[in-house]
Regions:
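Phosphate-binding loop of NTP-binding sites
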Residues: 79-166
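N-terminal leader/targeting and accessory segments in enzymes
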Residues: 1-85
Length: 166
């Protein structure tokens, strides 16, 4: 996808992916530089740009030498919206399950009910990404936004129309 089409700005370049970890940046990636509890993504902007980041989403006032700065009052939200546009399309029916107990069971039962009703369905959660043919263990109860959106895109590409997750 062209960077200008993704951002709505008059800029050149091709976006090849999204990354939250500077070690996963490849040429053409959009890097999300966010402050966290343990790490500050802003400390890794230079490394991300050196690895080929084409743009960096961060808070207002943060310098991004060598790449397009995409500042925002809510940088995580802007990053997620841009990534969503990049990874689209997604399955048409998506259900999220929240609560304290029973999420994994509810998600898996929902996937099985959809399958029994004739829908191509998947679930995402503690068990990993489960479809009718396989379960891919992710090791994450809640994947980060890039992993989640990439998984959703992959499921849609495989013809999955219904996804339930927690």
């Amino acid at each position: 996808m062209r960077l200008g089409a993704l951002t709505g700005l008059d800029v050149a370049g091709k976006v090849t992916g999204f990354a939250l970890d500077h070690r996963k940046v490849a040429p053409g990636c959009v890097f999300g530089a966010f402050r966290g509890r343990r790490f500050n993504g802003e400390d890794y902007i230079d490394a991300a740009v050196a690895a080929g980041a084409i743009a960096v989403v961060t808070r207002e006032g943060v310098a991004v030498p060598g790449a397009l700065a995409l500042p925002a009052d809510e940088p995580r939200r802007r990053f997620a919206l841009l990534a969503g546009k990049f990874f689209a399309p997604f399955p048409g029916t998506c259900v999220a399950v929240t609560g304290t107990n029973g999420k994994t069971s509810t998600v898996e039962l929902t996937r099985q009910l959809w399958r029994m009703a004739g829908h191509s369905a998947a679930s995402i959660g503690t068990l990993g990404v489960t479809t009718a043919s396989e379960t891919v263990t992710t090791g994450l109860t809640t994947p980060d936004v890039v992993t989640f959106l990439a998984n959703m895109h992959g499921l849609a590409r495989e013809g999955v129309g219904h996804v339930c997750r927690h």
